[in-house]
Structures are given as C-alpha cells and as structure tokens.
Amino acid sequence: MKIGYMTNAFGPLVGAGGGVTSVKDIRYVTMTDDEATLEQITKIGFKSIEVLEGNLTNYADDPQVLIDMLAKYGADMMSVCVGANFIYQDALEDEMVHLRAVAEMAAKVGVKYFVICGGAIRGKGIQPGDVELLAKGLSKAMEITEEYGLVACFHPHLGSIAEKPEEIDALFAASDIKVCPDLAHLKAGGYDPLTFIKK
C-alpha cells in the first residue's frame, strides 16, 4: 500500500479568481509555499503527496520545475484532487476542458490517481435526476483520464450531492467510478467509514 500526504493541510484553501467568470478556469488552490511544504512532508517520512489542482497547474508553463522539485526531495505526486459541478449541462463542456487541462499536466509529472470531488447542490436543493447527471459527468471525466493513463476516483465530499450515506450509495449505484474514501468527510456526513469501505 502506498500512503501519501495531502498538501492542503499547509495553508488556506481558496479558489482561483478566474473561475468566478470562467468555468474552465476554476481551480482549488492551497495557499502555501509548495517546496517548503514538500520538504516538511518528506522530512517526517512521507514520499508521496496529493495536491489540489491549482497547485499542480500553477506549473503548467514549466512542468520541469515541479518535476525537479519532487526529485530533489525523493518524492512523487501520487494524486491530484479536482472539483466540478457536473450537473449544469450548459457548463459541462467547459468543466471537461478544465479537467482535461489538469489531467494533461498530471500525466506530465507522473500522477497516478485523479481524485474528483463535486456534484453541486442547487439553490433549491438536490433535484430528481441530479445524481444521474453527476454520474454522466463522471463518465465523461473517466474517458478523459483514461486518455492520459490516470485512474479516476470519486471522493465523497461535504457540501456536495454525495455527502450523506444514502446520497453516496445512490451515486455509486449509478456510476462505476472507483472511490477515494476520505474518512473524515465520510464520518462527518454520517457514514461509518469502515462500513463504507467494506461495501
């Protein structure tokens, strides 16, 4: 088993400003010094990391900078976490542009797992058919990740369609995507993590 450390514990989580007016430019970003964070993580014995998409795509103009940084500390980037709404059909095309850009960058630096969060909750709440829209969006995302040799997996997340046990079960009944079980999110959403993993 490979165990990694998520770098988002090292700073505030924000969204890239471009995403406010352009869906394809939305990103999660951890406000941290990436190299200092990598140094701290490897010092305590972890050799694999997961980052948020913005901390990966920040290096899109020169991926070698990130590749060299990982090599300097004898580390690898095992996964990247991305987010999307998936249920708004007029935005889905641009969300796939976003996911493709992240997948392309991930492949360049040797990432294996493409961890997906999402499934927006509408202002009027989860509506009939929303879970199916999420599942269809995830299918499109899986097609993209397969092109780049990445393994797509879904991370049930607080504040999304897949937060509560019945919501999570409904999604995985509608989708064959692999799972990334975040124990804290599962527990906070009311799902016993061990029960979920055994399923």
Locate each region found by the language model.
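Acidic/histidine-rich catalytic cores of soluble enzymes
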Residues: S48-I49, S139-K199
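Active-site groove signature of glycoside hydrolases
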Residues: A106-P128, V151-H157
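Charged helix-capping and loop-helix junction motifs
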Residues: D62-D68, L92-R100, Q127-L138, P165-E166, ...
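N-terminal pre-domain/capping segments
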Residues: M1-V109, S139, E146, L150, ...
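Conserved short-loop catalytic and cofactor-binding motifs
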Residues: D25, G54, D90, G129, ...
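Gly/Pro-rich active-site loop or hairpin
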Residues: L13, G17-T32, G125, P165, ...
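Active-site-proximal loop/turn and secondary-structure-junction residues that shape catalytic pockets
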Residues: A9-G11, E53-N55, G83-F86, G118-R122, ...
